[in-house]
Amino acid sequence: MPEGHTLHRLARLHQRRFAGAPVSVSSPQGRFADSASALNGRVLRRASAWGKHLFHHYVGGPVVHVHLGLYGTFTEWARPTDGWLPEPAGQVRMRMVGAEFGTDLRGPTVCESIDDGEVADVVARLGPDPLRSDANPSSAWSRITKSRRPIGALLMDQTVIAGVGNVYRNELLFRHRIDPQRPGRGIGEPEFDAAWNDLVSLMKVGLRRGKIIVVRPEHDHGLPSYLPDRPRTYVYRRAGEPCRVCGGVIRTALLEGRNVFWCPVCQT
């Protein structure tokens, strides 16, 4: 599932390509047809993201709410200069076409037209988003410090922190030497503050670069991060391999239905 930085990149891209002008909206698949018809020809006011949720705000009130889930994708394309649009390929839930660019949405968990009040309801269920300037980490800390749930599970709970997925979860805990099974109430406030600030920095890098980069230079053999063979993670999907820091064996287990990865030597 795409993590939060991906949705913020999409919001920035769609803001740049479509905002401020009328947009043609359709639903070749048909499942979004009624809403698409009501949106067609409206001006996109802005695009925004909160965690793993994308919002397209149109002049006049309607907001398209998208959650990609496990399988959703946007395919971006440049509008041909001859005026002919490409035929939709596959099950396109929503197609947006602007003056110079188009995008096709396939396979989302959610694609719906809602109003501002319903947007507020969605956001009210979410924790702070590290990529938003209005993020309030104290609300996440207040939930974590009272919880007996493992910190590895709490980080994936979108009501605690919005936008963190399995890669950032595993890598953040490794970088701060925290066992994913440790109860939330066993996390000290200085540990939380350091991890939050690190998460903000890591996700900003992901937003800027378009990929998750978490390995520190001292563990990366001095290679620049754009090399194709660069080690991209410390523990994620590295079960049975040696730890990049201590040489111990990376372990994996299920934690509330999701795979968690950690180094039993480095993380306590």
From Swiss-Prot:
Zinc finger annotations (FPG-type) as residue ranges: 234-268
Keyword Zinc-finger carried by entry: yes
E.C. designation(s): 3.2.2.-, 4.2.99.18
GO molecular function, one term: single-stranded DNA binding
Pfam family, one: H2TH
PROSITE patterns: ZF_FPG_1, ZF_FPG_2
Listed cofactors: Zn(2+)
Induction and repression of expression: Expressed in mid-log phase.
CDD domains tied to this protein: AcNei1_N
Catalytic reactions on record: 2'-deoxyribonucleotide-(2'-deoxyribose 5'-phosphate)-2'-deoxyribonucleotide-DNA = a 3'-end 2'-deoxyribonucleotide-(2,3-dehydro-2,3-deoxyribose 5'-phosphate)-DNA + a 5'-end 5'-phospho-2'-deoxyribonucleoside-DNA + H(+)
Primary role: Involved in base excision repair of DNA damaged by oxidation or by mutagenic agents. DNA glycosylase that recognizes and removes damaged pyrimidines. Excises Tg:A (thymine glycol, prefers 5R isomers), Tg:G, 5,6-dihydrouracil:G base pairs and urea:A, also excises oxidized purine derivatives guanidinohydantoin:C and spiroiminodihydantoin:C. Poorly cleaves dsDNA with uracil substitutions, thus also acting as a weak uracil-DNA glycosylase. Acts on DNA bubble and 3'-fork structures, suggesting a role in replication-associated DNA repair.
PANTHER family in the record: ENDONUCLEASE 8 (PTHR42697), ENDONUCLEASE 8 1 (PTHR42697:SF3)
Full protein name: Endonuclease 8 1
